[in-house]
């Protein structure tokens, strides 16, 4: 491998449904072992890493039990909650991590821990971005990943759509981040990597760029 000074680690099997077919080793080998290989390459070359993690590191059941209020087109988070790390703007980085989160989310969280160990042990510099819903050109949307492009394509080409879960009304909400905005963020972090070294950030579009499936 030619010399390099940075790895942008965004490779993964990104489906939350991956592994439910009885093949968990594929997800573990692709996501966790893949990150391990990238970290070793970075260590041997004296390189740093920007790791694109996921909002799926947060446990599914805990999220599903959050107090919500039902509006005409979407669910809104209630002010009163029984867990920390949640507010009107959504989840922050202090949200509890105990519980199940899918093999995808678990392997990405374990990859975060690996990066933090490499930072501590080998003096590598790195930053972790827990991305929410990303979208933009060349996203190949499908049922289990790339929801914005998938839904847009189904509307354009007259495909079938169904609301799954949460009462089947399509009121569940996700915020969306364009890939160009993610690019700007990464550039900003790299310009002052010492400041962001070892930090974990939730990365999304925020309430201003959020929508429900129904909307």
Model-derived segments and spans:
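Protein kinase-like catalytic domain
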Residues: 43, 119, 156, 190-194
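PAPS/PAP-binding and catalytic site of the sulfotransferase fold
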Residues: 210-215
């Amino acid at each position: 491998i030619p010399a390099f000074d940075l790895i942008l680690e965004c490779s993964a099997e990104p489906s939350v449904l991956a592994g439910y077919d009885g093949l968990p080793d594929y997800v573990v080998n692709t996501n966790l072992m893949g990150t391990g290989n990238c970290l070793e390459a970075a260590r041997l070359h004296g390189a740093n890493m920007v790791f694109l993690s996921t909002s799926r590191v947060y446990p599914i059941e805990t999220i599903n039990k959050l107090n919500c209020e039902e509006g005409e087109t979407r669910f809104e988070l209630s002010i009163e909650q029984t867990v920390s790390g949640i507010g009107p703007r959504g989840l922050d980085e202090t949200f509890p991590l105990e519980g199940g989160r899918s093999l995808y989310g678990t392997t990405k969280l374990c990859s975060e821990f690996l990066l933090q160990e490499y930072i501590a042990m080998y003096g590598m510099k790195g930053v972790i971005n827990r991305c929410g819903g990303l979208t933009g050109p060349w996203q190949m949307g499908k049922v289990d990943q790339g929801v914005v492009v998938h839904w847009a394509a189904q509307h354009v080409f007259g495909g079938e759509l169904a609301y799954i879960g949460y009462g089947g009304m399509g009121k569940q909400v996700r915020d969306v981040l364009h890939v160009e905005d993610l690019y700007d963020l990464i550039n900003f972090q790299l310009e002052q990597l010492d400041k962001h070294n070892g930090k974990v950030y939730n990365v999304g579009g925020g309430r201003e760029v959020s929508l429900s499936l129904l909307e």
